[in-house]
């Protein structure tokens, strides 16, 4: 893994004293020993989620999250001259909402904290930050549907509104991204339904 020690690569996927990434809502690599009581016993474990199996010792396999990204967490572009970015104005509030979701580091703490092992917060963050920006519009209809389908295929559970994911997220990502994911998924599913012509009866 990256071993960045800056809280941005997500590879420090540990459960500290029963809480994914530790009790201070920061990444494990940014947790200081001074934050704990002198002489206390600290219990460090790997994540426990069926979709993220333990490889060895404290290392878990988070590649399922990468495959969810590969299913739709990208934008398409062409080579050669590109449109002027200034020609695509984005409202400040939309920009802030997109950037608040884009800070997800894919650490998997949300999955480890969820009683269902759900990756809805992670997937919702990726869908939200791309779907709100002009560059993400070409794949918007299919993105959420494809990513949720891959999430299900990887064995992640469904969301039942516990809210533990957002509570432990070191980037403090809001549950609002799950609402966006659900809305976009329904749109994608609706677009896949066959369109039937209404039968007209002869008068």
Give the location of each predicted region:
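Hydrophobic/aromatic-rich structural module bridging two neighboring secondary-structure elements via a short loop
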Residues: 1, 5-45
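Ferredoxin-type iron-sulfur electron-transfer modules in oxidoreductases and energy-metabolism complexes
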Residues: 43-203
């Amino acid at each position: 893994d990256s071993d960045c020690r800056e809280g941005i690569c997500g590879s420090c996927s540990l459960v500290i004293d029963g809480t994914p990434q530790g009790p201070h809502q920061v990444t494990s690599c940014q947790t200081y020993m001074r934050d704990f009581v002198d002489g206390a016993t600290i219990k460090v474990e790997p994540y426990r989620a069926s979709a993220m199996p333990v490889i060895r010792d404290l290392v878990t396999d988070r590649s399922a999250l990468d495959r969810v990204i590969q299913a739709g967490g990208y934008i398409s572009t062409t080579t050669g001259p590109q449109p002027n970015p200034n020609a695509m104005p984005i409202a400040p509030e939309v920009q802030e909402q997109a950037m608040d979701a884009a800070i997800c580091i894919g650490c998997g703490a949300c999955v480890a904290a969820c009683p269902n092992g759900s990756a809805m917060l992670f997937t919702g963050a990726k869908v939200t930050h791309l779907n709100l920006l002009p560059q993400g519009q070409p794949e918007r209809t299919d993105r959420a549907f494809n990513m949720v389908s891959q999430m299900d295929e990887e064995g992640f559970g469904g969301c039942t509104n516990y809210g533990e994911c957002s509570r432990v997220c070191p980037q403090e990502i809001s549950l609002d991204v799950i609402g966006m994911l659900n809305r976009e998924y329904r749109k994608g599913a609706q677009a896949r339904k066959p369109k039937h012509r209404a039968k007209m009866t002869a008068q």
